[in-house]
């Protein structure tokens, strides 16, 4: 079931959307036209999921150059949804825009609820009768900003969706089911069955230390869900155009003006029976170029999108030099340790430029580019777009492959035999055991005798060895260490 939230600008649609979804997904600001594209969220209640669509404010009299596209996006959401919420400002009474929207929505013959928002006081509630003239019989007064009567709206939605209310017994059963079972726990390879790096036997103290650490490093099984892919880049490089070209529909509003996209827009798409969620983000700009609070919130949400995505697609403009902002985004992606692909958009404008020479030169411009996959594409001409899916799938397969503990130990044991650690104060680094701890982020855990015996050059040597052995050139990964506790002196 899908619910579309519609209304003229600045009536509190995004505030209501955030309340229903119980997350701050949409930017809320007193500036009209803050929301432009369709935003998707979820109501998770009654052991069910209801999809919610937030839309931009519809005002046919507005001179905003985006208004036509906002209007089209809102009507598309109304067609897509099975239940409609028309949001009005109870303090303003019925406006011409409210009347026009009601006339548009009533003929759709879908359940339609009039949400009289901003009913913050008893005096506001006395104006309910004014809205009977819209011809909508299902009416609820709310205050999204103060969380008033949202429960009544949710109950009405439940009734329309015909979702039964779970009994007390069923709720208790659900809570018990959420507890992890012994069968669901993921156990590591038994410590006793693995070959240690050195032939010398462990002391009882070392064996107890290692066995306890291994028991604490169980890794949860991967979640079966759509792959999240965020398109990141500075304004006006064509992020929204790429999504529209991939989906073959005008899903995101595009314009030549930087800053057109403000919210992070999640767009679900299925390709070759694989599910993806593309996250269209606002362009990151230099701090001094951010002119208002809406742009500041958009930029902060771009960083949040990087933190929650599985793979980043950094979009750059082929006609421009790699900018300071591009390099800043690359460092941000590296900081969050996200696998990434670089999309060089607007390649149709690069007349007479050899692609391989361009890619070689691009790799020299920033160390964070490294061995990242680089695709030269054209959203306008739909050139090389299908390569995006293969690049995403290839890197995600590597990034989510759980490596065998036995294989990790053999690779590191071989590395230590080829190049022994240096002796420091009469002692040498020992690696007792190693595991592939997690895939998100990709992390190896090494159990060692002492952190003080691990030098930076040797750590880099181990990291390069693992990178080559497991083809991790395009997957950021970390090495973590657990050192044996120092002996207590008597």
Swiss-Prot record:
GO terms for molecular function: GTP binding; ribosome binding. GTP 2 binds at residues 233-240, 280-284, 345-348. GTP 1 binds at residues 7-14, 54-58, 117-120. It holds the Pfam family KH_dom-like. SUPFAM superfamilies: P-loop containing nucleoside triphosphate hydrolases, Probable GTPase Der, C-terminal domain. Residues 1-165, 227-400 form the EngA-type G domain. Keywords: GTP-binding, Nucleotide-binding, Repeat, Ribosome biogenesis. One of its GO terms (biological process) is ribosome biogenesis. Residues 401-485 form the KH-like domain. Disulfide bonds: none annotated. HAMAP family: GTPase_Der. Belongs to the TRAFAC class TrmE-Era-EngA-EngB-Septin-like GTPase superfamily. EngA (Der) GTPase family. Associates with the 50S ribosomal subunit. GTPase that plays an essential role in the late steps of ribosome biogenesis. This is GTPase Der. It comes from Chlamydia trachomatis serovar D (strain ATCC VR-885 / DSM 19411 / UW-3/Cx). The gene is der.
């Amino acid at each position: 079931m899908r619910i579309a939230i519609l209304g003229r600008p600045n009536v509190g649609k995004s505030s209501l959307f955030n309340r229903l979804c119980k997350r701050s997904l949409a930017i809320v600001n007193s500036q009209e036209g803050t929301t432009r594209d369709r935003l998707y969220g979820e109501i998770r209640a009654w052991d069910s999921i209801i999809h919610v669509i937030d839309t931009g404010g519809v005002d046919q009299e507005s001179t905003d150059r985006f208004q036509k596209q906002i209007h089209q996006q809102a009507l598309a959401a109304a067609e897509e949804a099975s239940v409609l919420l028309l949001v009005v400002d109870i303090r303003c009474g019925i406006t011409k825009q409210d009347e026009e929207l009601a006339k548009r929505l009533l003929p759709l013959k879908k359940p339609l609820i009039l949400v009289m928002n901003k009913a913050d006081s008893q005096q506001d509630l006395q104006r309910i009768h004014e809205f009977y003239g819209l011809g909508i019989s299902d009416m609820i007064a709310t205050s999204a900003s103060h969380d008033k009567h949202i429960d009544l709206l949710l109950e009405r939605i439940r009734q329309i969706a015909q979702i039964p209310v779970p009994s007390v017994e069923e709720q208790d059963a659900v809570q018990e089911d959420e507890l992890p079972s012994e069968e669901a726990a993921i156990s590591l390879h038994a410590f006793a069955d693995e070959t240690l790096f050195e032939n010398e036997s462990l002391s009882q103290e070392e064996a107890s230390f290692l066995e306890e650490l291994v028991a604490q490093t169980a890794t949860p099984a991967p979640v079966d869900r759509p792959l999240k892919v965020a398109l990141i880049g500075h304004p006006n490089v064509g992020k929204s155009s790429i999504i529209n070209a991939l989906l073959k529909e005008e899903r995101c509003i595009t314009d030549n003006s930087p800053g057109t996209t403000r919210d992070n827009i999640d767009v679900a798409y299925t390709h070759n029976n694989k599910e993806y969620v593309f996250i269209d983000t606002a362009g990151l700009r230099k701090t001094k170029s951010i002119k208002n609070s809406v742009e500041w919130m958009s930029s902060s949400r771009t960083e949040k999108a990087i933190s929650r995505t599985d793979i980043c697609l950094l979009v750059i403009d082929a006609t421009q030099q790699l900018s300071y902002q591009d390099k800043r985004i690359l460092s941000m992606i590296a900081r969050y340790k996200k696998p990434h692909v670089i999309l060089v958009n607007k390649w149709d404008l690069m007349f007479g430029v050899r692609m391989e020479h361009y890619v070689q030169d691009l790799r020299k411009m920033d160390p964070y580019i490294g061995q990242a996959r680089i695709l030269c594409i054209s959203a306008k001409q739909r050139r090389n777009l299908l390569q995006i899916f293969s690049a995403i799938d290839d890197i995600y397969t590597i990034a989510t492959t759980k490596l065998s503990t036995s294989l990790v130990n053999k690779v590191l044991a071989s590395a230590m035999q080829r190049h022994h650690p240096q002796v420091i104060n009469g002692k040498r680094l020992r690696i007792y055991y190693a595991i592939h701890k997690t895939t998100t982020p990709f992390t190896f855990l090494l159990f060692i005798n002492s952190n003080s015996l691990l030098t930076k050059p040797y750590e880099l040597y181990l990291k390069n060895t693992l990178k080559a052995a497991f083809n991790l050139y395009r997957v950021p990964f970390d090495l973590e260490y657990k050192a044996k506790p120092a002996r207590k002196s008597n």
